[in-house]
């Protein structure tokens, strides 16, 4: 939202009134989540929940990792107008360059999080039929959707719409066709 406001208004003064401090703190927070496995040169983010709240405590949620990169890049872009400490700048450059950003597989589909494609691939209706109570929560450790590819909201579709210049139309269409039938379209309000 900050970058949309600045790009629309040209009001860079907002950076001196707390906005730059806010986005720097967001970048530091995301940086604090990064881990690097011994056998990898890439940073990963583990144990998160993306917009799809049916799958909790996942690793490398594509949406979360891409948003972290966006925050790193935003701080670096704004550093032209708002000077950064060299150590922080180098840390954010390293984070942006080396964070794991999921790529499309051979079918053009981006995996929502590590292990998503290994989950049971069933329809939303099949999962709905497993409910004991119609008001039962689908997610969490014991939810009926937790071990399936059925999702509450399509993280990948949201990510692609936010960063559409990074992907081809074909990749966007392929992912929409893959994820839409697996999306339950539950309320974006938690639980």
Question: What is the role of each PLM region?
Answer:
Residues 4-8, 17, 73, 77-80, ...:
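Active-site core of glycosidic bond-cleaving carbohydrate-active enzymes
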Residues 23, 28-33, 152, 172-176:
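Structured mid-domain segments that build the active-site/substrate or prosthetic-cofactor binding neighborhood
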